[in-house]
Amino acid sequence: MSSLKEQLAQVAASNATVALDRKRRQKLHSASLIYNPKTAATQDYDFIFDNATSALEELVEIDVRFKVFSRSLFSASSVNIDRNTQTKEQVRTLDQAVNAYLMLASAWWHLTPTLHATEWLVRRFQIHVHNAEMLLLSTLNYYQSPVFKRILNIVKLPPLFSSLANFAKAESVPSNLTIVKLFNDMDFLTLYTSYVGKVVKQKVTYTNQLLFNSCAFINLVAFNSNSEEKLERLVPILLEVCAKLLASPSDDCQMAAHTVLVVLVTALPLKKQILLAATETILANLADSASTKRCAFVTVCKLFQTLKGHGNVDQLPANIYTLFDSKISNDCLIDFLSKKETPADKFVTSYVRSIARYDHGKLNSIVSILKQVKLEKFEVRLIITDLIHLSELLEDKSQLIQLFEFFISIDEDMVLRCLHSLNLTGELFEIRLTTSLFSAERIEPVNGEDVVKGLEASKVAGLAGGAQPFTEFLNKNSAYICTKNISLLVEDDEQASKLLSLFVESVGKKYQPGLFLSSFFTTLESRITFLLRIIVSPGAPVALRLISVSNLSKLIHTIGNDTNVFTLVPVLIVALTDISKNVRAAVKKVLHQISKRPFTKRYFLNDKIYGEGQSVPMLNPKESESWLKTFLDGYLVENYDISQLLIPKKNEKMYLLFWANQALYMPLPQPKLVLMRFLARHESFSSTYSQLWENFLSSYLEQRPQWELKCSKNKTNFCEFESVLVLLLSKKEKNPAAIEFLLGALKSPFEQLASIMAKRLIEIYPTLKQPVQCQIVQDIIESTASADLSYDSIETLQSLALSADVVVSVIKQNMINVDETSNIIKKRRRRSSASNKAALQKEEVSRIAEIHLRKLTILLEALDKIKVQGSEALLTSLFDILADLDTLDNDGGLPVLYAQETLASCMLHTIDSLRATGATPKLRSVRTDILVAAIRASSSPQVQNKLLLVISALALLNPELVLHSIMPIFTFMGAHSLRQDDEFSTMVVEKTVKTVVPALLESGSSSMTDEIEFLLMSFSTAFSHVPKHRRVRLFTTLIKTLQPSSSIAPFLFLLSQQFSAKVENFEIAESKSILEFSRSFMSKFAVLDQLTGIAGLFELVKLLSEPDLKDKTSPRTLLSNGILNYTPSEMFNYKRNTFDFMDKILAEDNQGGNKGENNLKLKLLSALLDPQTEEQVKSDVKDQFAKVLQHNLVFINNVEELCSTQDLTEQGKSDGDESGSEPDNDNPVADMTEILFSLLGHILDLLPISTFVESILPLLGKDTEDIIRKHLTLVIGTKFESEPNSSATYANMTASSLLAIVTDEAEAPGVVQAALNTTSTLVSKFGDRLDASTLTECLKIGVQKLNSSSTDIVVSALAVLTNTVHVLGVKSIGFYAKIVPRALAIFDSVQDTKSDLRKEVQLSVVLLFAAMMKRIPSFLQSNLKDVMRAIFFADEVQNSISLYVISLLVQQLDLKEVLKTLYRIWTTDISKTGNSVAVSLFLTTLESTVEAIDKKSATSQSPTFFKLLLAMFEYRSVSTFDNNTISRIEASVHQIANIYVLKLNDKIFRPLFALTVRWAFDGESVSNLQITKVERLTAFFKFFNKLQESLKSIITSYFTYLLEPTNALLNDFHSGAVSDTNLRRLTLTALTASFKYDRDEYWKSTARFELLAESLVNQLANIEDSIGKYLVKAIAALASNNAGVDEHSKLLHRALVEHMKASCATSQKLWAVKATKLIYAKVGEHWLVLLPQLVPVIAELLEDDDEEVEQEVRTGLVKVVETVLGEPFDRYLT
């Protein structure tokens, strides 16, 4: 019986959708999957139904199974169905229909129609309440999609889904971990697996759902992987759901089950019975698709891999084996295993053992299965043991031969161990299987008789073979009895194999061998040859071979002595190679037996032994007797190699011929193989003997299939047979038939033979004659080019030891331009002809051309790989090939790029090998024009690069050969190769330059200079196309190869033209790139080369200035690029840009690009100062530097002439010059001069300081032009800036010279200014390292120049004084009186002017004072006010500098004096100015001073500070700034005041505060009579409010000083005498803060309270609406402060009630209500006693005519009172 709780839950669930009130019904109806509740609440069922039916129709089109619901859930009658009025049966039917719909719809929740259709079920049938479980289960796999969020938002979550409750209204979606924890609940898992079973049964599963199920179950297993107990609880549930999935015909369902099973058994290995049951279930309903079968097989394998312990690889149960065999075919099994997707050894072992037990017909397939999997040793042992047992039962034991051969090949020892464990030996088992299995060293019986005696029928025949009379055996096999007098050596292999097996069987049944032989072979000849065949048969067991030897001996005794049995010896000699020592010993005995017989002329079976009518040439009896005795004397049984004994040295040729015939006529493959091996390995075997084999070799390719079959049936290794066969092709082979066999074998379709022959060819090729070699190579090339061969002909060809002569011969056979190559004098390249093109367009000719190209390619690849020693003929032939390729490319359009590249490699190697030999060939027939043409015509950069390397190599081998092609080569390189951005192309260009250019230089040609300049032009033209990161290395290589001394200048000249063009076209990035390159480029050369190049560039620019230039220099190549055609303006721009280019090259790169060890300046210093540098080098460097300097000065002196081309501008215009006819600068002379002086400075800067000073000081004399002296002076400053302090001596010398210039009254102002600036730099740089007299002189001259009429000179003088004062400090005090007043006067003189130098003057004066502050601060106090005024009013100086000077002032000077000075300067200057910068700096200084001043000083200066403070409070009345600016200033002042007050104690601060109050209220100490009382009060209350925020309760008692004045002020506000809203707000804020921060019951004093309370409340009468809230807060704060004093509360309450009467104004009542509401909200409990007096007032206010008042009371005051009371207020009103 269910519990009461459960009964109540059922009742609640059934009534979940019963709504008894309107709100409940509306809430139920507004639950929607699509619409928000407000929209859903307005919709009727008809609208929802129409949408749903339309959506259902769309779903029906997708899945027709939805149609059934159109007659139930979506029928027209469903609109009127109310599940609350249905019977239980009807409700159950309805739930079943809903559940069926949800299971079907589960697959389509990602579609909009599903939402709209399900919306009907939610709205009409409330499935989110009654079918919530199924709704959630069917959509759970959408847990991270928006649709699931919608469902969670409306569904009533069942208890099992409670973990999803947190996501119902949240923004986030359930995580993967949430789902795992949900499934970890066993009750939920049971529920979900039940649902899975239902969907599988209903056949409504789909891929995403199954994927979710699999992932959920897998994650669940992983989540509990550490808890074996939990996993064991999961096993039955998961196995049940897997069984349901496997029962489905769906591929997806089965795959899902496979996945889950694999993970489950991996986490928790299961019992074998469970795994077998699972396997049976997997196989029972296995789908036919290949993917499902593969998945099932992998699963089964993984299941079996988890088995542990004894019996884990037992045979499969019969029903499972049968089931597996019916579902998965053998081919599928092998295919699955070959993919090796999973370990399968355990299953395969069980499966193979099952085959051995149940299905003997499939034994033949076991090997193919085992080859695909690697088994453990114990698994192999079990299978072998099973098969050995099976051999006892199996009638046809031949099925096991292949199996045991496989096992023996992988582990022979294990097979023998298994046999021994079953009391079997290897030889007996061989007899049982009627074949040879084991190697002889493993099984060694004593002799044949012992074997026969030891045989037991049961061990040989097995349990299947019982005792059988011989007659019965004979009758059964009578068909195989041989009655003819024939040789069994040539008998059909099938017949012989059967007789062999019968012989083995008879021996195994213990029949006497003689009985078998006499019964089955009626003639002696057939018996003997049968035994011979067994003795040399690899398929016969060793024991049987021993028995055969024994019986052969007996039969020989029966042959008469008149018969010579030497015919048997060759076969017995083969038997001596048997791997069994016992067999060899037995055979030796037989040979001894034969040697003792008479050697007559009648040979036994001489014409029949190798075939009927085959008469084999034999040795004469005497020779045969002698040979056999000699052989037996030398033979030892232990000796396996008998080749030396076989063919003795004496009569070697005769014996070689004899054995060659024996090998030729031998019909059996194994003996033939042995004899051929003996022959081929003999040192005397040659092509002479191979002639015997002509017929055999000629027919072998046709008969090869028969030989392969024969080897297979006789168990002879066919690969070994053919390997020995090809050995018949001897070294130095010349037999045409043998060569034809070789070529035929290579072209044959037999891969094995072709590969073996290829290896043999590689071995014998070097010994062949050249014609044969050529024939073979040509044949290989032709066959490779025309057909697909079965061996790697390319590798074979590349492995041959080709010689240059062979290659040349083959090349000649493969040429198409033979007529042209024969004429070696021709130097013109062959031109393409229309006839050639037309011919090559024909299909047949085109095909031949393609084959020809393939031939050339094959040959070139081989040549490239082999690296043949080069010769002139070979190199000539290679150039002929290049011509052929040119023809095929141009005329035939064939792809020759690869061939050309390979050819280039061959050429390179050939040339290198010629150079290595030291040969100097004339190479007259080598046509470099073809090479150059190929380079130009090729579209491949790789080919071009390779061919350029060929040219480089040729230049090294024979320089004259390439000289006439230099120009085309470098033209091409400039247009193509330089543009390639790869390391190889760069290397090629560099190598070409390094090899070809020296050839040009060494040639001594008269036109060499022109060619070099042409080369430079070619390369420089391509400059912009060369990748940036490769330029420096490339062009450095070029110039170094061309000799830097003569080529840097032309190259820079060409580069400067490009730079100028980029600048004129505003291509800034490109011009910078050229500059960066030039700096790096120049740094790669020695200092002398750099200076020579710069001087040369000056000379070339000078050359352009000569008159009649065009006519004069027209022959020069360097000027042939159009520069002579420049218009005058273009020429001017070029020169200007070139000088700028030079200047920037020499300038130090600020970013460090030119400051490394390769810097020209450093190199110059090293050359001049390094003691190891030779004097000649120093002299040369100085000479070149002098040239550079001289050129620069010449251009400066002739700058007017240099710019005179501007006069021709108009002429240029008239001649049609439309491009850039005007220079960029309006003053070209000044522009050019500036650049030249900058260049001069950088040139001089290169010198070491000592040389620099010696060189430059003489130039400062009067004889030098002023402008040059000015620039030189500036250069001095720049030079010394980068010098170390150790150069102070030179600086002192320079400073003295400069001061001498300054003192000269006749000097030009510009020179004087420059001298002062440079002197300032020197003083700043070297400081006290300069002589004291020099520094004193600086002060004197600086003071003197302060009186100059030139402001520029004054500024420079101030700079000198600043730096000198900074250095001398107190020592400069003697000049203080002369400096400061004059500096202040200078400052004042520019303040009211618009001078261009106003900023510079202000900055100079400020910096002078800063220096004095640092060095002589105490002396500066006498002029502190003026100094500070100068700082404040220096509005042109940057803020950062001013702030720095102010920080110095605060740090260095006495702060008391500073504070006094600030007060004075405020009153006299700052308060009267409109300069915002001055005010800002003043406030900054004041703040810094206040922050830095100590408390003692602050106390002593407090009167001064407060005077300043009051003066600043009055600033508002006199300032011209806007209100916002003044407010910001006041805010800063308040902040500063707060900081200062914190440094004072109460004793000091109180009187000052009282003074401030009196100033505010009474006007005491007012300095500005224009300020009004309201302004004073406003300023005061702002200050007081900030003070209260900072000090809080500390200054609450200070309110005493302003209590009565404030009360009077409040009364004035009430009466209207004062009506300033802002002041009123500030006053109320001050009162609120004071009430709020009162911690000492200051305001609980009755006197103070009564004085202020009424005045404060009276403000309600006329408070402005904008500040009413401040009044409410003040009243509430006062009430809160006095909450514990009942009398005060009553007084305040009565006052408030007075303002809420009906007679009061609306605003007055409203604010009074708000004040009362806030009071009750804060201290309601204390005011509850006053509530009775308030109730009538509230009742009256609730009936107030003003709606706003009524609403405020009803919704505000009443609600607050109810909150305090804890009960409705209505009962107080009744």
Curated annotation (Swiss-Prot):
UniProt-listed InterPro entries: ARM-like, ARM-type_fold, BP28_C_dom, HEAT_type_2, HEAT_Utp10/HEAT1, U3snoRNP10_N, UTP10
Pfam families in the record: BP28CT (PF08146), HEAT_HEATR1 (PF23243), U3snoRNP10 (PF12397)
GO cellular component, one term: 90S preribosome
Domain of life: Eukaryota
Subcellular localization, as worded in the UniProt entry: Nucleus, Nucleolus
GO molecular function terms attached to this record: snoRNA binding; U3 snoRNA binding
Keywords noted in UniProt: Nucleus, Repeat, Ribonucleoprotein, Ribosome biogenesis, rRNA processing
The HEAT repeat ranges on this chain: 1734-1772
Disordered, as annotated region: 1209-1228
Any GO BP annotation: positive regulation of transcription by RNA polymerase I
Family: Belongs to the HEATR1/UTP10 family.
Function of the molecule: Involved in nucleolar processing of pre-18S ribosomal RNA. Involved in ribosome biosynthesis.
Subunit annotation: Component of the ribosomal small subunit (SSU) processome.
Entry protein name: U3 small nucleolar RNA-associated protein 10
Protein's gene: UTP10
